[in-house]
């Protein structure tokens, strides 16, 4: 059986980003995990940046470093919890962290370093996140 293929149109991609930017009037964060869902991380970051997108979300530290390689001034949010040994790369590459449990907060405190963090709070979907009463 042949594989299916999707071809992305650069003009349409940028147009869609512009529509989203105009609807939200807020800074957008483009999720580019898993090689931009198979569409090519480098392609997605370059073209999104051409549209003014400066913030990208990834699933791994390696993906975050790839984004920084394509667009050094980008802001990168790591969606997954990294291992303690990855924290040095995170610090060196100025990657924001997602915090969704107390044990990871304790790990960050133990390092005595400063990190940009985003709290993921479980508001009822029961996927990931700290219960609101913890904060």
Regions found by a protein language model. Name each.
Residues 1-23:
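Positively charged, low-complexity intrinsically disordered leader regions
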Residues 4-7, 26-135:
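Active-site-proximal beta-alpha core segment in soluble small-molecule metabolic enzymes
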């Amino acid at each position: 059986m042949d594989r299916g293929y999707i071809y992305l149109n650069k003009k349409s991609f940028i147009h869609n980003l512009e529509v989203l930017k105009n609807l939200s009037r807020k800074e957008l964060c483009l999720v580019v995990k898993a090689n931009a869902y198979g569409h090519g991380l480098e392609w997605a970051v370059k073209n999104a940046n051409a549209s003014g997108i400066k913030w990208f979300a990834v699933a791994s530290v390696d993906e975050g470093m790839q984004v920084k390689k394509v667009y050094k001034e980008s802001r990168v949010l790591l969606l997954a919890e990294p291992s303690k040994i990855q924290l040095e790369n995170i610090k060196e590459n100025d990657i924001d962290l997602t915090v969704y449990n107390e044990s990871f907060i304790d790990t960050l405190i133990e390092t005595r370093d400063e990190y940009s963090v985003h709290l993921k709070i479980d508001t009822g979907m029961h996927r990931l996140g700290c219960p609101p009463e913890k904060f």
